[in-house]
């Protein structure tokens, strides 16, 4: 899936509509985690320094087509301004005369941020009129929002059909990392899949079983697999109607000689709440009135033993009820262990969600090979499904050897020119 990127187009003096994913958490009117904002800075910086006039666009939360003051993008614009060291204004609405005028006033290298796209119901409906209104702002479209690439919305698909459409650096990196993960992983290859339900991850489990050597299962979905093994799970979250599917997955793993690791001991609690009584017990002895909320130490030892040999690891989903600190130990411990594996040279890719939160809360993010900005998008990509927001972008043409050589020369010349432009000017007396 080789798409043209922002380096493949002359953006100087052009209005460029950049779809970013600034769907970040807010606390007390401030951005509490700016990792998604920072992830698109390379694309924004490149376009600005090459003279583009940037119209940045994102959604925030789920306002259901209505204006909600708590989901306005002003805090995001303020954080972006701090990161860039320059003022990035946010418009009062994604549409309207005031926004049109603000776009027209942009100069080369300047940018603005449109107000929350999802304040308009037309965004999620991929409404062609709304898409055209967005397209009218710009001459070029760039998608750098991998987290929404699996959604066919007006700002991800509709507009991309109306303008020359290119990939941003973040989107390109996400696709490259996930493609490499599934196509040419260093072995042994281990996958850790957690989270609440097996039903939402059946397809990705099937795809992973074609590739991995070890499959580690945790979180609520592991409870359904414990049922498939004939164990009881008390009052734990489980999908009883998916037990046969879990048996099928286990049989498929055995057929493909994939080692499956399930909890052998678990943390159980009387209630899934803070301050409740909890204890660690063998997975065969779960009381009828208790809930499984985390994996135990023996299970972590099994997981770490398998992961110590892995040269490639993919992780998606927590191992327990991560939102409650007392039940987050397993997830946090695996995050720390995987950081040490990455330090030792293993490729460790994290596929979004609460796995990312466990990493960031412990200050481990910089140690991982890649942390995806799109949980749902990364899973759909690994399932082998087309991502609408990627498919619609322009494909890179297949070049002849002579054309490749010429393109390489042009790229090298451009890189030299860019390096020269960054050198400080030589000052002094004129000759003679």
Language-model segments: residues:
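Active-site loop-to-helix "anion-binding N-cap" substructures in soluble metabolic enzymes
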Residues: 1-400, 404, 409-412, 422-432
